């Protein structure tokens, strides 16, 4: 999605891009803007962006502006700035973003050789669920698949405007990537849910962390907390899904983007300050 938005901005002669971000968008915008020789301005909620994501934006040379407010306030600001100044907005309100992101649905279809029965996906600004549905519909209308998936969107309980059908003024969740109270793509997401006979559900932070741990311990997959919302949601709603259904859960971010969460939320054994000798290490290993 971002490579499409940046490429079109470059094509149109843009010299700078801007976005509001909970972390992932800023990292992506900064990377592609740098590759395209453009400046990248990113507005983030001060103190509410995972360090791994902030590090990416900084390394790519983004001009980071941390505000006293949440993502939704940052988005309001960048939307207004992009209307009055020579910067291109690359949040998912930019239609080119969704045109790029929809190709993820193409990849799923090509891998499975059909659409899944269910697609489970985290929702923050709701660009992904909107774009995936766009992609599935395009393949269906082109008669490349025989069915469409039910779109299942999951939000953190403390940040679930689509689930509760209201703006959340002060969203809060451990899953920082989806800590958004007023998603810009809400109408598109609701349309995806309704057209597909899907549903939206909320999952608690505890449910997210439990799924996060399961992915690491049982599947060897290290994702960021927001990604685990799709697994948490599936586990929470599995009784409503028929046996033998083909289900795809989308994981939207690598765990290294939020290392603090990993350090604080794991069941691993970590013994430190050990003496450097065979006897101590053998004992620590339980032999």
Question: What is each PLM-predicted segment?
Answer:
Residues 1-16:
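Helix-rich "cap/lid" substructures immediately adjacent to catalytic or cofactor-binding pockets
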Residues 1-4, 91-105, 224-228:
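A glycine-rich, Thr/Ser-enriched phosphate-binding loop motif common to dinucleotide/cofactor-binding enzymes
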Residues 17-26, 93-97, 121-126, 204, ...:
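Active-site nucleophile and cofactor-binding loops and adjacent substrate-binding regions
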Residues 18, 26-69, 73-80, 163-168, ...:
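Active-site-proximal loop->helix
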Residues 28-31, 36, 60, 94-196, ...:
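Glycine-rich phosphate/pyrophosphate-binding loop at beta-loop-alpha junctions
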Residues 35, 231-287:
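Catalytic phosphate/nucleotide-handling subdomain of diverse soluble enzymes
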Residues 69-86, 138-223, 264-287:
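Active-site/ligand-binding loops adjacent to catalytic centers
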Residues 121-124, 149, 209-213, 220-238, ...:
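Substrate-binding/catalytic subdomain of NAD(P)-dependent oxidoreductase enzymes
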């Amino acid at each position: 999605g971002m490579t499409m938005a940046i490429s079109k901005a470059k094509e149109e002669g843009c010299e700078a891009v801007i976005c509001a971000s909970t972390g992932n968008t800023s990292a992506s915008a900064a990377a592609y803007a740098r590759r395209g020789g453009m400046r990248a301005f990113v507005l983030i909620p001060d103190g509410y962006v995972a360090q791994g994501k902030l590090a990416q934006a900084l390394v790519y040379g983004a001009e980071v502006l941390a505000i006293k407010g949440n993502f939704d306030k940052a988005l309001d600001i960048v939307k207004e700035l992009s209307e009055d100044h020579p910067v291109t907005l690359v949040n998912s309100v930019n239609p080119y973003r969704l045109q790029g992101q929809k190709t993820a649905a193409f990849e799923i279809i090509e891998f499975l050789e059909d659409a899944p029965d269910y697609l489970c996906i985290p929702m923050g600004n709701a660009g992904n669920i909107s774009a995936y549905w766009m992609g599935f519909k395009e393949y269906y209308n082109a008669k490349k698949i025989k069915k469409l998936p039910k779109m299942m969107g999951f939000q953190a309980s403390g940040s679930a405007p689509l689930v509760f059908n209201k703006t959340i003024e002060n969203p809060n969740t451990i899953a920082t990537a989806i800590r958004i109270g007023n998603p810009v793509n809400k109408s598109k997401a609701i349309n995806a849910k309704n057209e597909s006979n899907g549903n939206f559900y909320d999952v608690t932070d505890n449910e997210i962390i439990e799924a996060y741990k399961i992915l690491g311990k049982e599947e060897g997959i290290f994702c960021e907390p927001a990604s685990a919302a799709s697994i948490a949601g599936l586990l929470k709603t599995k009784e409503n899904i028929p046996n033998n259904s083909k289900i795809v859960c989308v994981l939207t971010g690598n765990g290294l983007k939020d290392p603090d969460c990993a350090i604080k939320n794991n069941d691993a054994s970590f013994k430190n300050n050990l003496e450097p000798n065979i006897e101590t290490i053998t004992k620590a290993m339980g032999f």
